[in-house]
């Protein structure tokens, strides 16, 4: 049979990620769950080259539905897999196996998922509940998760390192753990990760309104969980937001020794109402930050009815990082008064 794809492409507003409930993002029962697989471009290509009958066999002849976001990102893709827990537990390892070239002696699988930090739970909860549960079904399985949030989202990258034999029961254990968490917090807000090529945008109104300024994950020094390397590589990398300990930094980027003096552009996306509050409370704040950091700061013209504005910051990577830190601190401080 000819090669093809059983994946349905869906549209998404990449600059304004939706805010969903935990139940909307993942599901709330074992009969229908949504798992968000994070795949590399090579893995997607391998999937698309598979004959249609093999794809259908892996997806249990339509019992497992797969959707992906339409985007120009060439580095990462999200496969949203929807089915029962039992179907997903067998289909996901099979899918990862066929799209990941491995040596014969290497029977391990790395399964990458995007999962909300709040659904996943605290480090204490993970170590007291999830990891012992995984270890009880497979003592060779490792659970890794990204130190910071995926770009413009409230999700982390979660990686399961397991062997082919145990992969299905490991996935089933993880999915049941997530369902048990959602039963307690079904309406908690989630900003899902949508891979895109709009890498110059720093944050979004969705994340701005969802992240509490007291959260240890998001601070003025690291707004939205994006590390400073995002600025130094903002010139040519299609996916420069190096927010994970698992994925390697791929694609061209500005060498750090050049980035120190090279001028780069960044945009900070903020709610219009919040920027209006800043103008009212501190009318000269943007000029003050610009002078303090030696970065050029302007507010782009936008539709008067838009609920979003873009603050453009132009300067060296160091100047931009300092300016964005101060902008974030000024904006978030308005919510404390």
UniProtKB/Swiss-Prot annotation:
The keyword Cytoplasm applies. It is found in: Cytoplasm; Nucleus. Keywords: Cytoplasm, mRNA processing, mRNA splicing, Nucleus, Ribonucleoprotein, RNA-binding, Spliceosome. Residues 263-327 form the KH domain. One of its GO terms (molecular function) is mRNA binding. GO terms for cellular component: cytoplasm; nucleus; spliceosomal complex; U1 snRNP. GO terms for biological process: mRNA 5'-splice site recognition; regulation of gene expression; regulation of RNA metabolic process. Component of the U1 snRNP particle, which recognizes and binds the 5'-splice site of pre-mRNA. Together with other non-snRNP factors, U1 snRNP forms the spliceosomal commitment complex, that targets pre-mRNA to the splicing pathway. This is U1 snRNP-associated protein usp108. It comes from Schizosaccharomyces pombe (strain 972 / ATCC 24843).
């Amino acid at each position: 049979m000819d090669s093809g794809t059983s994946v349905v492409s869906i549209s998404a507003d990449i600059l304004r990620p939706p805010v969903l409930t935990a139940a909307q993002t993942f599901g709330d029962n074992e009969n229908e769950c949504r798992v968000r697989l994070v795949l590399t471009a090579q893995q997607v290509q391998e999937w698309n080259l598979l004959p249609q009958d093999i794809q259908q066999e892996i997806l249990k002849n339509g019992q497992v539905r797969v959707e992906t976001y339409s985007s120009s990102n060439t580095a990462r893709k999200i496969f949203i897999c929807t089915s029962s827990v039992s179907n997903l537990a067998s289909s996901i390892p099979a899918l990862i196996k066929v799209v990941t070239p491995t040596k014969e002696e290497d029977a391990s699988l790395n399964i990458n998922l995007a999962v909300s930090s709040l659904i996943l739970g605290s480090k204490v909860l993970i170590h007291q509940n999830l990891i012992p549960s995984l270890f009880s079904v497979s003592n060779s399985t490792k659970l890794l998760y990204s130190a910071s949030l995926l770009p413009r989202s409230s999700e982390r990258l979660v990686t399961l390192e397991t062997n082919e034999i145990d992969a299905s029961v490991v996935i089933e254990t993880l999915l049941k753990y997530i369902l048990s968490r959602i039963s307690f917090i079904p309406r908690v807000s989630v900003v899902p990760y949508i891979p895109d090529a709009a890498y110059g945008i720093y944050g979004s109104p969705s994340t701005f309104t969802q992240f509490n300024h007291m959260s240890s994950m998001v601070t003025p020094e690291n707004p939205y969980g994006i590390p400073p390397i995002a600025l130094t590589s903002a010139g040519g990398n299609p996916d420069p937001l190096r927010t994970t300990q698992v994925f390697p930094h791929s694609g061209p980027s500005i060498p750090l020794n050049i980035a120190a003096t090279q001028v780069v552009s960044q945009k900070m996306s903020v709610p219009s109402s919040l920027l209006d509050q800043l103008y009212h409370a501190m009318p000269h704040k943007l000029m003050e930050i610009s002078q303090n950091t030696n970065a050029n700061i302007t507010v782009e013209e936008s539709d008067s009815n838009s609920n979003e504005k873009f603050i453009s910051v132009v300067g060296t990577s160091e100047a931009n990082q300092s300016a964005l830190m101060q902008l974030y601190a000024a904006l978030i401080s308005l919510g404390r008064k």
